[in-house]
A protein has these predicted regions:
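Solvent-exposed, non-transmembrane regions of membrane-associated and secreted proteins
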Residues: 1-174
Length: 174
């Protein structure tokens, strides 16, 4: 589930957040500097209770580029957290898939395994996506291992019935 938070400069934003019991962590993200380093940066992901605190990139022509390329463009691991071009950069798709390696040194998405601990899951109910003009708050409602089937290409998640069936399957295994 996602909550799009109203713009911070509006009077409505603090009230909505307060009523939901959500405090958005302050992040000092310099998107200008990040984009100077790599113009494919368009967001930042932060997952409390983990080491996930990284820029999010999307290559314009090669969906797998950041699987084996780092922020500076060098080839190798750990790569970057990224989305494929099938997802829009404004996070309005029914399902946005963020990719990243499960590194043995605990970096990238490796620490998402922390959510296998029920206490971590309960103490960290949200993760945050920061963009230049908005902050998105996502409620973590499931944490489970998934196979390598490409979700977006194998499920028509734009179809509300198929999307609901997909969510129902998640609720069954979580």
């Amino acid at each position: 589930a996602t909550e799009e938070v109203p713009e911070p400069e509006t009077e409505e934003a603090p009230d909505v957040l307060k009523s939901l019991g959500i405090e958005i962590p302050e992040k000092d993200i310099d998107f200008t500097a990040l984009k100077e380093e790599n113009s494919d940066v368009y967001a930042w992901i932060y997952v409390p209770g983990t080491n996930v605190d990284y820029p999010v990139l999307q290559h314009p022509t090669d969906d797998a580029y950041y699987l084996e390329h780092n922020m500076d463009g060098s080839k190798g691991l750990p790569g970057c957290i990224y989305t494929e071009s099938v997802n829009t950069k404004d996070f309005t798709d029914p399902n946005t898939v963020l990719y990243g390696h499960n590194m043995k040194n605990g970096s990238m998405f490796a620490s998402l395994h922390n959510f296998e601990d029920q206490q971590v899951f309960e103490e960290n109910p949200y993760f945050y996506i920061y963009t230049e003009d908005k902050t998105y708050v996502y409620e973590i409602f499931a944490a489970y291992k998934y196979n390598a089937i490409h979700l977006i290409y194998n499920f028509d998640l734009d179809n509300p019935e198929i999307f609901q069936n997909y969510l129902d399957q998640i609720f069954e295994v979580r």
